[in-house]
Amino acid sequence: MIKLTPAMKQYYDAKKQHSDALIFFRMGDFYESFGEDAKIIAKELEITLTTRGKDIEGEKMPLAGIPYHALDNYLPRLIKKGYKVAICEQLEDPKKAKGIIKRGVVRVVTPGTAIDTSMFTDPSNNYLMSISGGDGDYGVSFLDVSTGEFLTTQFADKSPYDRIASEAARMRPSECIISRTMFSDERLVERLKELNVLVQGFKDEAFDVDSSRKLLERHFNVSTLEGMGCAGLPYATSSAGAALDYALTTQMRELGHVSELSTYSDSEFMMLDSITLRNLEIVKNVRGEGNDTSILKVLDDTNTPMGGRLLQKWLLKPLINVDSIDHRLDALECLANDTMLRFDVRSHLSFVKDIERLIGRVVYGNSNARDLIALKRSLGSVPQIVESMGDDPGCEMLINIRDGLLGFEQLENIVKLIDDAIVDEPPVSVREGGMIRSGYNEKLDELKGMSTGGKTWIASFQQKERDRTGIKSLKVGYNRVFGYYIEITKSNIAQIPDDYIRKQTMRNAERFYTPELKEWEDVILSADEKITALENELFTEITSRIASHASDLQRIAVLIGQLDCTASLAEVAVNNNFVRPNITSDCKILIREGRHPVVEKTVRGGFVPNDTEMDCVDEQFLLITGPNMAGKSTYMRQVSLIVIMAQAGSFVPASHASIGIVDRVFTRVGAFDDLASGQSTFMVEMVELANILNNATPKSLVLLDEIGRGTSTYDGYSIAKAVVEYIHNKGRVGVRSLFATHYHQLTNISSSLKRVKNYHIAVKEDGDDLVFLRKIVPGATDKSYGIHVARLAGVPHKVTQRAKEVLQDIEDESVISKESDSKRGRKKKSAQYTQLMLFDPEGSSAPVAEPDPVVEELKELDVNSMTPIEALNKLSELQKKAGKGGK
């Protein structure tokens, strides 16, 4: 076994402590990695893989490294790929170190605990998710280390996978921790991975309720968690405690900006599961790269990262309390109606940066001088924002925001502190120096004078030596290894004075120094070193003073986010002709001239608006027919998006809208084969349908598009009909539903189910051409126009012409069959033509069909015991009986 160098022993010690992480090991001006880590880093970062020395086994040691100043460029690339990286720093000044330099891991960066701004490509929250549970109760927590936001909840569910997946889909965490025991639950892990969440197993003891409670109480400096709302929620407490434990373990320092824990309940918000969020494209475009077609993209005209994050939360968690929704709508209306107020507020907001993350970096201890300048300019806009709002902004929410911004007395002092201390254009790194303004510190100014004077002397010394030696090319230079030197080209060596002392030999030149130059070098370098040390000391002092006001600054950030989010929605409403919805506690949904907020921006020739009227009593179930491409799916999505926008607190695309509160939106639209889990289109459809039928409440809104199309015609029709009956008859109050179908026979069901209403998308036939009018009108249609659509799609004329002939043959055969049946007076028993109820209406019983004797006799036959002749004779006998009607 090879004996390791002291530095490599440090590396192996760090790797042993953080075996699940890639090690970035500081060696001078580089971060280096060895062994398998080096191979991974070289591959992922596309950098050179080389070798240095031997490993423990005596083999060549793989090596990969990056310059220390390029860490912010390379580290995000590894984190975004799901790696955990441990940063091992030099813990002492190499110049002052006695023997081997002390090194140690100072932080571990993971996808869910990243805090550097270089990690984030958009202003969205970067949540760490934590899950705990048992015996049907589960706790879920979300911690954003970059902003300090901390949330927890608890719910009861014997089968929690859908619920947990829905929370993950709404909050979109980068990483999730679960206990190592729970990590064996493959179904849970897979559901989270399907949502692109990195799942990590964490020590079981971190999820202990008592340990979590004590950790939370100690961190927040409280004696009880009652004020945070989770004192009686053991799993909410344990998941929150584990999240905080993981964050503290990886960051290796106190997280003072994580100053509050908020407990929320699902009962406060409309439930939008992962399927609905995908199908409606609320915040993410599911059609791949390219133009963003999400509703968030349409509504987001925010000026600040805080406003952008809040808007996303509002859309993902719409409210279900009428007063709370109206509270938001009142503020939006004030801003929409007052053009000057809206313009002034938004103008000042445009100068505000990401205060939440800036404060997080300041408290965390990795901010730079440019962060402080950004914070100064952001906070400097607050008085102007308040002034633009005037004495009476016109509604409660805006008044509360203005008063909250006015209430922070230290705002002016913080702005003045940064303005006095930091230069207007500071360097990127605090290591570079030159960030503290002249006049802020007397000792620093004195040192700067010495450094400046010394450098002035260097310039005059260079000119003096040129004159003395007659060497015009003589120059005085500096590098970190050799210090200051006089450089003479080889062709002028004969002219050097006797007092020049050789320092370094180059290929084309020689470098020298004089006792006088050495003396001034000591003065300059000593001053520069002291300047750097003092600037760092002063910067730490300044950031500490700012960090002491972190909680107040975070509250300012929250208020600015609320104002920006509301002002953005007002701007979008005015620019897009949206109207304020009337929110009610009943179940009626009335929309006049509703429009799809995304499609109307992209459709050619103008969007055709449509009305919607539904409730739980008379117009509960809208059965929509019409050809493919006519707009059935767009119409249904349009209704649901208007409802979601309204309850999020936004104006809506319509001329009038009255929305009865919806507690949950269910969607079964589109078809995505779940190949990864081995589920076919039809299986996925049935799983999603089962979720809807089992969980919809009288307050829900259900969207079903082409149920049954993933199987045979008869099976599909039967399932579709059964679903209509089940939803219609479920409870005394019907679930508001929109159901698009291509089974035209299904429209007859409205004659027996009184709350089912038929609608269809109007089309106009012009010879062989088909014009989609995009208008939804009452009544059913008996045509699908499939061949017309095929022609529009570019199917060859020969194929569509043959399809018309086949269709005509089928229709003729159907007519002949009906006439023949009529003449014989036979009763039609086919499920295709008979309105038999697959689910009985409440309080009634379905008639029992009389068994067919031919069928019964056929069932009783023992074919295996019969000879071929006996079988043929029996078949002939049964055929004769069947020909006589079976009796």
UniProtKB/Swiss-Prot annotation:
Keywords: ATP-binding, DNA damage, DNA repair, DNA-binding, Nucleotide-binding. GO terms for molecular function: ATP binding; ATP-dependent DNA damage sensor activity; damaged DNA binding; mismatched DNA binding. It comes from the Archaea. Coiled coil: none annotated. GO terms for biological process: mismatch repair. The keyword Nucleotide-binding applies. InterPro entries: DNA_mismatch_repair_MutS, DNA_mismatch_repair_MutS-lik_N, DNA_mismatch_repair_MutS/MSH, DNA_mismatch_repair_MutS_C, DNA_mismatch_repair_MutS_clamp, DNA_mismatch_repair_MutS_core, DNA_mismatch_repair_MutS_N, DNA_mismatch_repair_MutS_sf. ATP binds at residues 626-633. This protein is involved in the repair of mismatches in DNA. It is possible that it carries out the mismatch recognition step. This protein has a weak ATPase activity. Belongs to the DNA mismatch repair MutS family. This is DNA mismatch repair protein MutS.
